[in-house]
Amino acid sequence: MDIRLTGVTKRFKSVEALSRVDLHIRDGELFTLLGPSGCGKTTTLRLIAGFYVPNEGKIMFGDREVQEIPTSKRNIGMVFQNYALWPHMTVYRNVAYGLQFKKVPKSEWPRIVNEALTKVGLVGYETRYPGQLSGGQQQRVALARALALNPDVLLLDEPLSNLDAKIRGSVRAEIRKLQQSLGITTVYVTHDQEEALTLSDRIGIMCDGKLVQIGTPHDLYEKPSTRFVADFIGTNNLVAGTVEAVGEDII
C-alpha cells in the first residue's frame, strides 16, 4: 500500500504544526520521519493514522482518499511510544484486543494470536501479564497486537525510546527483519539519527512543520540539502574554516 500526502496542513488554534507537506511513501518500504522535538513528525504520523484531520490537503492510501475516514476503517496497525498494553489483560488478550472490533470470529482468535506471537518470537508467553515482561518483550507484544490485525500499513511512534540502550539495537534489528519479511508499508517516527540511518529504506527530515529533505540514508549523509540537515544527520558533515585562497584544483 503506497501513501500520498498532498499539500497537507494541520493547525492547532493559531499554531501551524504542519505546513503544506507533500510526501509519497512507497508500497512495502520502511519510511522514517526524523527530526527534533516539535518538528511535526508525530503530527504527520497521527494524520496518517486518522487521529487528526488535516485543515488542508489530501491523504491517499493507494487510490483511496482517507483524510475523512476514521482510524477504524483505514486498516492500520499502530505501535505507540508507551506500548499501551492493558495491565489487567494477559498477553493473549492484549494481542487479540483489536480482533473483537474487527468482528473476527472468536474461533479464529487462537490461530491469529499464535501467528502474531510467532512472528515476534513470543510463543509461550500467552498467559503472562505485561508487568511480568521486560521492556523489550512488552514492545514485541505491542507489535504482535498491531500485526494481528493484518494491516495494510504499520505505524510506529518512537517504539524504542523506552528501552534500555543495551537492547535497543537488537530490537531494532528484529523490527527491520520482520518488516522486510512481511513486505508491509511501514512509517516509523524517531528523533534518533542512528535508528533512522540503520532501519530505513528512506528518511524524511522535518523541521518546523516542513519536510526539508527526503532520501536514502546514504544520500542524506553524503548530500545534505541544507545546513540543518547536515548538522542534524551527523557531526562529521560540517567543517569550520576560512577560505584564504582559491586555485585550479584546491581551495
Name every feature range the model reports, one short phrase each.
Residues 34-36:
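The feature captures the beta-strand-to-loop junction immediately N-terminal to the Walker
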Residues 30, 71-77, 81, 85-231:
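ABC ATPase nucleotide-binding domains
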Residues 49:
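Helix-to-loop junction immediately C-terminal to a conserved catalytic motif
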Residues 57-65:
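Conserved ABC transporter NBD signature motif
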Residues 225-251:
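ATPase nucleotide-binding modules
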Residues 55-58, 108, 208, 240:
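Conserved coupling/switch loops of ABC nucleotide-binding domains, chiefly the family-specific signature
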